[in-house]
């Protein structure tokens, strides 16, 4: 039976060439093969005859075969369409076949691209550029970091596709998946990119089909699934258009691969995908959205989002036709359950219907582009000047009318209707409740639309048992409403005085002061940077400390000022503290450590005040480091390391004003990190002073410092600053001393340990604003000083590598070959380390050096380098080896009893190939398997690994 079915399918497949109707094959499969009656083994036989995997459950194999015929139908349609288009096009003369689409191109630009594309000229021109550590050919594979780190990542991929450069960037299906997961922005560049991608990897490509690693139209259904599940609308839309996929194929693919519950999840991108598919009639009946789960539209409902995002979210969610079906479900449930409690939902439905009707009369064209691209918060806070005289100016908040339709009402009322409609919808579908973080109304909704809520009620909602959004709460009510000064002053009093300070008492334990809440409140008040407001806060707290001392224990005024000084950015507030609260705060005490602030103007002004009263500041490296990192962590900002480095530079440059507190080992660890940041940012002045300043005299261990700033692409110049005066001969002498002392047999317990002492010199070239030598810590501009440090062999070699001094490494190996016998160089050449730092250019140099200097130890290093090249996908390295008959015979042939000239046994070469397979470098994998003389058994195992790995991606 099964053989007959298989022959029918194969015959039908051949007949396709005559009638060009792939759908007949699919229909034949559906008609002749009944899922319930056919056995798994029969399906496996059919799958095998079609060249499909036979592993899996019965349902998986069935869907695999079904998807195969769907893809054949799409491919057949695409080829027929392309053929018809070509036949309909009139024949063009040969000289008119290629037309330059961009007109008026400058002649110099044409010459430039001719030279740029000519590899011989290109290499000759750029041969003088010494930085060979990283280049275009080192970009292997695609991941999220690659796509986001390179601003021209799309152009790099497109250039790679057009040039067919060894498939080094797109090596497998997994690389395409990473693209789909990441590139979702709808713009002309992304659309053009996806069209290029689909064209390059399809049956219509101009490349040889055999050279393709895969074809999109071989697995149409699976790619539809992947784009939907990754919520990539722009890729899905272009995919459907490029391959001319009709709604029947889409429906069948969704039925086969998408769980109906996927569309019940409600996110902005999920709604966009669902409504798009619905608009092209591609949603199967079984997948029509009827229930809602895991709703998260918090980003779209934030008052910081743009108006057009809110309108789009409303249209995606409260779709009138979809809402009509929900009403029908509601009525059906009411009839079945006959419960009175559903009557309340009727009111919600009636209200929502009315709002839908009102909002349907307001189209987006009634809003200006400025309004659509403004945030909700800005629109609601917008003010206009209504009265202006020679003596006074009155500014009042006014309704903002929609410019194109004065009957539509003010924008505040319209925005409220959008929000109200969405939250009514949540109530109707039984998903909204007060304690659902993703569904609760944002605090701004209450501030703008629900003003009847009291302050204490709002606090209980947003800062009560379930939420601790203190900072968001206080910032929203004090800073986001565009309030007048007197209103803010009144709010501060009310917050402090609510039921004897309830906002600052822990719920359920009234005597336990809530410091987090209070600190958040003070942070917001100080961040407003208004002298009157801060003074009002301090005076009000003083009164409350007397009145409510037994119930609410507020911190001291000194602690409040010191803790929040970091949020001050106006000099007049510093003067205010100096003149009015000098005796109530430690901020102006001698040797105090409460002055930390990230604003240069504040520090500069504060320093002058301290000098005027002849007081000094103390800089505790540990405290300052911890403060800096914690502030950035709280603010969720990326560290601006230069703020910390510049402050240290100021302090070191002013020894009469600053004293340093050094806390032994803990201090040393922090200083190492700071030194690493200095290296990374090329802060030459700070490096000079740390290394030469007596206050920081330490036996610097450079291994830890440099290791903290890897990888190399940011530190080459900084390492050069340290090593510029250290010759290979001086390094050789130090290594020789170590050899005599230890004979490279003494192995430290941890390979980071430094034991090679080196001496370097640094010249101060950085200028300063003062000529007073005391102001730069006795370090005279232009003077050269030496300093000693220790370094491990591994990091020594790393530094030489970063400085493009690989020849010096080889020189040291030649002079002191015993270094190969130690456990130290192997740490440099171990696979995990080389993988992280080594480019294809330098890896090739290492391989060639080891080939020319073969011995028992270098063979191990050679094998490690080959494994790294295999894992990274540096196919050119292996092609160079294969081009040399001598090298290929003993490097890439199996060592056996009869072939002792080869270096590596079968298991080692197998592992090398597996490295390339595991990193999806399948083209390299096949190249190696084709050349290496593996046994039939090993070859079968390796090819099976390739098949499984490529199909699992």
Curated annotation (Swiss-Prot):
GO terms for molecular function: DNA binding. It comes from Dictyostelium discoideum. Residues 11-21 have a biased composition (Acidic residues). Belongs to the UPF0746 family. It comes from the Eukaryota. The keyword Iron does not apply. This is UPF0746 protein DDB_G0281301. Residues 1-10 have a biased composition (Basic and acidic residues). Disulfide bonds: none annotated. Residues 35-69 form the SAP domain.
């Amino acid at each position: 039976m099964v053989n007959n079915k298989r022959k029918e399918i194969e015959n039908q497949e051949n007949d396709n060439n005559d009638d060009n109707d792939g759908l007949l094959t699919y229909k034949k499969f559906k008609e002749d093969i009944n899922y319930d009656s056919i056995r798994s083994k029969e399906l496996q036989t059919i799958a095998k005859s079609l060249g499909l995997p036979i592993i899996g459950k019965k349902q998986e194999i069935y869907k695999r075969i079904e998807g195969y015929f769907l893809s054949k139908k799409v491919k057949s349609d695409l080829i027929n369409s392309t053929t018809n288009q070509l036949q309909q096009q009139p024949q063009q003369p040969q000289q008119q076949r290629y037309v330059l689409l961009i007109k008026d191109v400058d002649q110099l630009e044409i010459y430039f691209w001719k030279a740029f594309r000519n590899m011989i000229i290109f290499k000759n021109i750029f041969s003088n550029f010494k930085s060979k550590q990283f280049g275009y050919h080192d970009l292997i594979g695609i991941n999220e970091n690659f796509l986001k780190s390179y601003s021209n990542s799309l152009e790099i991929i497109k250039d790679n596709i057009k040039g067919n450069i060894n498939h080094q960037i797109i090596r497998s299906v997994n690389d395409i998946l990473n693209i789909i997961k990441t590139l979702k922005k709808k713009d002309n560049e992304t659309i053009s990119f996806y069209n290029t991608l689909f064209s390059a990897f399809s049956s219509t490509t101009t490349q040889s089909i055999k050279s393709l690693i895969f074809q999109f139209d071989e697995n149409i259904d699976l790619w539809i699934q992947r784009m939907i599940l990754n919520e990539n609308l722009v890729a899905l839309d272009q995919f459907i258009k490029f391959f001319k996929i009709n709604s029947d194929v889409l429906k069948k693919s969704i039925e086969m691969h998408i769980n109906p519950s996927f569309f019940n999840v409600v996110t902005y991108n999920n709604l966009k995908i669902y409504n798009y598919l619905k608009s092209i009639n591609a949603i199967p009946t079984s997948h029509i959205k009827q229930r809602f789960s895991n709703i998260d539209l918090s980003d779209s409902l934030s008052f910081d989002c743009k108006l057009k995002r809110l309108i789009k979210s409303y249209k995606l969610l409260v779709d009138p036709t979809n809402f009509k079906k929900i009403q029908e479900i509601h009525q059906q449930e009411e009839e079945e359950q006959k419960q009175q409690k559903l009557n309340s939902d009727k009111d919600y439905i009636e209200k929502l219907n009315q709002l839908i009707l009102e909002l349907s009369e307001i189209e987006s064209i009634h809003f200006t582009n400025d309004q659509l691209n403004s945030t909700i918060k800005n629109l609601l806070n917008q003010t206009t000047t209504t009265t202006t005289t020679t003596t006074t100016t009155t500014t009042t908040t006014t309704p903002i009318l929609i410019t194109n339709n004065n009957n539509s009402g003010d924008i505040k009322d319209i925005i409220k209707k959008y929000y109200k409609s969405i939250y009514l919808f949540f109530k109707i579908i039984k998903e909204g409740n007060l304690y659902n973080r993703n569904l609760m109304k944002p605090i701004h909704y209450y501030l703008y639309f629900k003003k009847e809520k009291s302050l204490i009620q709002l606090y209980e909602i947003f800062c009560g048992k379930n939420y601790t959004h203190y900072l968001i709460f206080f910032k929203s009510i004090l800073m986001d409403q565009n309030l007048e000064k007197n209103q803010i002053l009144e709010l501060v009093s009310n917050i402090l005085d609510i039921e004897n300070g309830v906002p600052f008492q822990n719920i359920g334990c009234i005597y336990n002061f809530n410091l987090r809440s209070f600190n958040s409140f003070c942070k917001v008040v100080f961040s407003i940077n208004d002298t009157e407001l801060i003074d009002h806060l301090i005076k009000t707290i003083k009164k409350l400390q007397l009145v409510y001392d037994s119930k609410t224990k507020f911190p001291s005024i000194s602690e409040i000022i010191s803790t929040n000084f970091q949020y001050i950015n106006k000099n007049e507030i510093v003067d205010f503290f100096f003149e009015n609260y000098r005796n109530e705060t430690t901020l102006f005490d001698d040797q105090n450590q409460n002055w930390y602030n990230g604003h240069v103007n504040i520090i500069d002004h504060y320093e002058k005040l301290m000098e005027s009263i002849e007081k000094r500041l103390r800089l505790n490296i540990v405290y300052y480091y911890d403060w800096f990192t914690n502030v950035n962590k709280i603010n969720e900002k990326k560290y601006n390391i230069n703020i910390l480095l510049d402050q240290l530079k100021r302090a070191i440059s002013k020894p009469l004003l600053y004293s340093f507190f050094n806390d032994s080992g803990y201090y040393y660890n922090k200083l190492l990190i700071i030194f690493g940041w200095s290296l990374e940012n090329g802060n030459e002045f700070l490096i000079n002073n740390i290394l030469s300043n007596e206050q920081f005299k330490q036996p610097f261990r450079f291994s830890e410092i440099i290791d903290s700033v890897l990888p190399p692409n940011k530190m080459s110049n900084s390492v050069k600053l340290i090593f510029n005066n250290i010759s290979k001969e001086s390094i050789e002498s130090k290594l020789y001393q170590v050899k005599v002392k230890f004979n490279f047999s003494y192995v430290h317990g941890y390979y980071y340990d430094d034991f090679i002492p080196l001496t370097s010199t640094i010249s101060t070239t950085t200028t300063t604003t003062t000529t007073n030598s005391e102001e730069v810590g006795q370090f005279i501009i232009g003077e050269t000083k030496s300093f000693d440090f220790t370094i491990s062999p591994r990091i020594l070699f790393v530094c030489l590598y970063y400085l493009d001094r690989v020849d010096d490494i080889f020189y040291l190996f030649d002079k002191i070959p015993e270094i190969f016998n130690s456990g130290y160089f192997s740490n440099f050449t171990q696979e995990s380390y080389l993988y992280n730092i080594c480019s294809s250019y330098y890896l090739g140099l290492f391989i060639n050096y080891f080939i020319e200097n073969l011995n028992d130890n270098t063979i191990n290093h050679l094998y490690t380098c080959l494994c790294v090249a295999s894992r990274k996908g540096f196919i050119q390295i292996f092609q160079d080896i294969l081009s040399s008959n001598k090298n290929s015979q003993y490097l890439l042939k199996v060592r056996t009893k009869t072939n002792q000239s080869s270096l590596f046994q079968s298991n080692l070469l197998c592992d090398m190939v597996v490295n390339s397979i595991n990193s999806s470098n399948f083209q390299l994998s096949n190249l190696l398997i084709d050349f290496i003389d593996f046994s039939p058994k090993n070859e079968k195992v390796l090819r099976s690994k390739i098949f499984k790995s490529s199909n699992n991606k």
